[in-house]
Design a protein with these regions (language model features):
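Cytoplasmic juxtamembrane interface segments
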Residues: 1-7, 76-89, 147-170
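Aromatic- and glycine-rich beta-strand/loop motifs that create alpha-glucan
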Residues: 1-26, 242
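Membrane-helix interface segments
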Residues: 17-18, 82, 94-96, 100, ...
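Pore- or pathway-lining transmembrane helices of multi-pass membrane proteins that form conduits
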Residues: 21-26, 164-182
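Secretory targeting signals
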Residues: 26-68, 100-164, 204-209, 213-220
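Terminal transmembrane helical anchor/hairpin motif
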Residues: 35-52, 171-244
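Helix-loop-helix units of permease transmembrane domains in multi-pass membrane transporters
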Residues: 75-107
Length: 244
């Protein structure tokens, strides 16, 4: 049943307007990051690492939470129309399978987005910043860590989009979560807030490894928040009545 749900969710993406955002927002983020890097070369002297911080800081703080929030709201949009929710709750599909299917599809989109962001990073580094060689091997590792941290954000946004019928409100809350995440991280409590995990994983605000000596805690926090969001979704869906 889960496989059928995933196929159904994938069909929603065919000719979807969210693909325009998929391309536009990473390009905007890369443009801003590259411009900021080129304007501060006297300060940002660590080559590929410095460019990485400029590319990923605003991406992880603003653009990615907004994109994931939009993906999640779009996938829940059909269920919130008319009486579709009641029909779905009365269907033989296990409610958590529906949530898990949406999670799988948004995770796929996030993986594609991360790949596109890294391709833009390399392109801008070579073409505009004229950096020598190729990016250090640690940067793809940061990207993978960021994807692990992003899973908690994806699950959180799916819960918000599930319980809030408004399309715009979950997106606003996603942006708010990303903004608060950077401040919480700056105070040293990033592992306690799901929206900080991707920023920490991607090492988006410093050249030195922000997770040095804390990989275990980072993995635990990612798993904890992911499990918490799935448990919350299960409890809400168990009531078979999610309202705005």
């Amino acid at each position: 049943m889960l496989k059928r749900c995933i196929l159904a969710e994938n069909r929603k993406l065919h000719a979807s307007p969210i693909w325009a955002m998929f391309f536009v927002l990473p390009i905007l983020s890369a443009t801003y990051g590259t411009f900021n890097y080129l304007q501060n070369l006297e300060i940002l002297t660590d080559g590929w690492y410095s460019l990485w911080t400029q590319h990923t800081l605003f991406y992880s703080m603003f653009f990615f939470p907004a994109m994931v929030a939009t993906y999640a709201a779009y996938l829940w949009r059909l269920e919130h129309l008319g009486h579709n929710w009641n029909l779905i709750m009365a269907s033989p599909v296990p409610p958590l399978d529906l949530f898990a299917a949406k999670f799988a599809v948004v995770t796929k989109l996030a993986l594609l987005t991360h790949g596109f962001v890294f391709a833009l990073f390399v392109f801008c580094g070579k073409v505009f910043a004229h950096l020598p060689g190729l990016p250090p091997v640690t940067l793809p590792l940061f990207l993978l860590r960021g994807l692990l941290g992003a899973l908690a954000v994806i699950a959180a946004q799916l819960v918000l989009a599930m319980v809030i019928r408004s399309f715009a409100m979950p997106i606003f809350l996603g942006l708010l979560g990303g903004i608060t995440g950077i401040f919480i991280s700056s105070k040293g409590f990033g592992l306690l807030w799901p929206y900080s995990l991707m920023q920490l994983g991607m090492n988006s605000n410093k050249s030195a490894d922000a997770l040095a000596g804390s990989y275990g805690l980072f993995a635990f926090s990612c798993i904890f928040w992911l499990g918490t969001m799935f448990l919350l979704a299960w409890l809400l869906l168990k009531k078979r009545d999610v309202r705005a």
